[in-house]
C-alpha cells in the first residue's frame, strides 16, 4: 500500500459523513433502553426491598449518614462522577474515529460503568453503608483493606492536585506576556464565573439550612434550589471577581476542606443539587441545539488501530474514555457517600445506574459537539477539549437568542463545575479513606493518635 499521511488516511476511511442528529438519537435511544430494560432487570435480579431500612436511617448521624430525597442523592451522585472525563475523554479519543468512541460509550456505559456504579451502591447499602475498603475487609481481610485504602488515599491526592489546578486555571483572570502578568482577554468572563461559583457555595449553605429547618422535598425543594441558582448567576454576572490563578487555588483548597468535613446536608449535597440544575440546562441546550442544527459529524468514522500521537487503539481508547464508559472512581462515590444517604432501596437503580447513563449521554454529546466543530476535511478543532465543548454549546445557546456574554459565562461555569463537584467529592472520600485506614474495631479504647 502506498504511503499516505494520517490526515489522508482519515479521509479515506471517513466515507459518507453522518448527520449529528442521527448519532445523538442513537445514543439517547440505546442508553434509554438500556436503563429501562437492563437496569431494571438487574434491580429485580439482585433484589431490591422497598420496605427495608437503609443505613441512612439505621446509622443516622447528621453528618455522613443523612436520609435524603431521591433527586438529592441522584444530583450528588451525578455531579460527583461527571467530572472532566466525559468531556475530555471522548474528544481526545476521537482521533481514532467517532465510531469506536461511540460504541465504547454505549456498550461500556450500559454493561460496565452503570453496572459497576449500581453494584457498588447496592453492596454498600446492603452492608450497612460501609465503604469499599470496609467491605474488602469483610470478605478478604484487614491487609486487603489497608492496601486498598492506602491506594485510594494516594489516588485522591493526585486527583485533588490535578483538578484544583484545572479549576483555578478556569477562573484565572491573568495571563503572562513578555514576562509580565496582564489581564487576559477572558478576564471578565472568568471573573463572572468565579463569582458565581463562590455564590454557589454561599447559597448552598443557605439552601441546606432551609432544607434542614423546613424539611423541604419535591417541588418546594426544587423551587428553592432554582432560586438559589438564579440568585448566584444574577450576582455573579454583575460582580466579576478578578483574581490570579494562585488566589483561586487558595480559595479552592479552603472550599474543599470544608466540603470534606462539614455535614453532607450543609454544603456538599445542596451545592450538588444546585449544580445538577445547571448541568441539566447544559445537556438540554446541547441536545436541543443538535436536534435543531443537526450539524454534520465531520470527524472521520475510523482512522485505524494506531495513532502516531496516542499509540494503539487498545488499550488507549479504554484508558482515555474512562468517565462516560467505566471508571473505578465512581465506585468510591457510590459506596463512600451516596450509599449513606439513600432513604429507600428502590432509589438505588435511578441513582446508581441512572446517573451513569446520564453521564454516558453527556459524553456522547461531547463527541457530537467535537464532530460539529471539526473542519470539513476531518481536522479536529483547535483548543483544549473543554474549550471545544464550551464554544460549541455556547454557540447553540447563541442560536436560541441568548446573549453571547451570558452563554460564554454559563459554559465557563459549567466546565469548571464539572471539575469542582468531583474535586469536593474526592476530598471527602480522601478524608474518609484516611480515617478508615487507621481505624480499629474498638475506637473508644484506641490510642489517642488513632482517634485524632
Task: Please identify what each model-predicted range represents.
Residues 33-87, 276, 312, 316:
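Membrane-interface "cap" regions at the ends of multi-pass membrane proteins
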Amino acid at each position: 500500500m502506498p504511503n499516505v499521511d494520517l490526515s489522508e488516511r482519515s479521509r479515506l476511511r471517513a466515507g459518507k459523513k453522518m448527520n449529528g442528529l442521527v448519532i445523538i438519537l442513537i445514543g439517547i435511544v440505546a442508553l434509554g433502553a438500556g436503563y429501562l430494560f437492563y437496569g431494571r432487570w438487574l434491580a429485580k435480579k439482585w433484589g431490591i426491598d422497598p420496605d427495608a431500612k437503609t443505613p441512612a436511617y439505621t446509622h443516622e448521624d447528621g453528618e455522613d449518614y443523612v436520609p435524603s430525597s431521591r433527586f438529592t442523592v441522584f444530583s450528588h451522585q451525578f455531579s460527583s462522577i461527571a467530572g472532566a472525563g466525559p468531556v475530555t475523554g471522548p474528544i481526545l479519543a476521537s482521533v481514532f474515529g467517532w465510531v469506536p468512541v461511540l460504541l465504547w460509550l454505549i456498550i461500556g456505559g450500559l454493561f460496565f460503568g452503570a453496572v459497576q456504579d449500581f453494584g457498588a451502591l447496592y453492596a454498600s447499602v446492603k452492608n450497612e453503608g460501609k465503604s469499599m475498603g470496609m467491605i474488602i475487609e469483610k470478605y478478604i481481610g484487614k491487609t486487603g483493606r489497608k492496601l486498598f485504602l492506602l491506594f485510594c488515599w494516594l489516588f485522591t491526592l493526585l486527583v485533588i492536585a490535578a483538578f484544583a489546578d484545572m479549576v483555578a486555571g478556569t477562573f484565572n483572570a491573568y495571563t503572562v506576556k513578555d514576562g509580565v502578568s496582564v489581564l487576559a482577554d477572558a478576564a471578565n468572563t472568568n471573573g463572572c464565573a468565579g463569582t458565581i461559583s463562590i455564590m454557589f457555595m454561599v447559597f448552598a449553605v443557605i439552601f441546606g439550612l432551609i432544607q434542614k429547618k423546613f424539611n423541604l422535598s419535591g417541588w418546594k425543594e426544587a423551587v428553592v434550589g432554582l432560586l438559589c441558582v438564579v440568585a448566584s448567576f444574577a450576582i455573579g454576572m454583575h460582580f466579576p471577581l478578578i483574581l490570579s490563578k494562585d488566589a483561586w487555588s487558595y480559595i479552592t483548597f479552603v472550599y474543599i476542606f470544608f466540603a470534606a468535613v462539614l455535614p453532607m446536608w450543609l454544603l456538599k449535597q445542596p451545592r450538588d443539587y444546585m449544580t445538577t440544575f445547571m448541568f441539566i440546562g447544559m445537556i438540554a441546550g446541547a441536545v436541543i441545539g443538535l436536534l435543531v442544527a443537526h450539524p454534520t459529524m465531520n470527524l472521520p468514522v475510523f482512522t485505524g488501530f494506531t495513532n502516531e500521537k496516542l499509540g494503539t487503539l487498545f488499550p488507549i481508547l479504554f484508558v482515555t474514555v474512562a468517565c462516560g464508559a467505566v471508571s473505578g472512581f465512581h465506585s468510591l462515590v457510590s459506596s463512600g457517600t451516596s450509599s449513606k444517604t439513600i432513604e429507600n432501596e428502590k432509589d438505588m437503580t435511578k441513582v446508581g445506574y441512572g446517573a451513569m447513563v446520564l453521564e454516558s449521554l453527556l459524553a456522547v454529546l461531547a463527541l457530537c459537539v467535537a464532530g460539529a466543530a471539526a473542519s470539513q476535511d476531518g481536522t479536529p478543532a483547535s483548543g483544549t477539549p473543554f474549550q471545544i465543548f464550551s464554544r460549541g454549546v455556547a454557540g447553540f445557546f447563541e442560536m436560541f437568542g441568548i446573549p453571547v456574554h451570558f452563554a460564554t459565562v454559563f459554559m465557563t461555569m459549567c466546565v469548571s463545575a464539572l471539575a469542582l463537584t468531583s474535586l469536593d467529592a474526592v476530598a471527602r472520600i480522601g478524608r474518609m479513606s484516611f480515617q478508615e485506614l487507621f481505624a480499629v474495631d474498638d475506637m473508644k479504647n484506641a490510642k489517642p493518635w488513632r482517634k485524632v
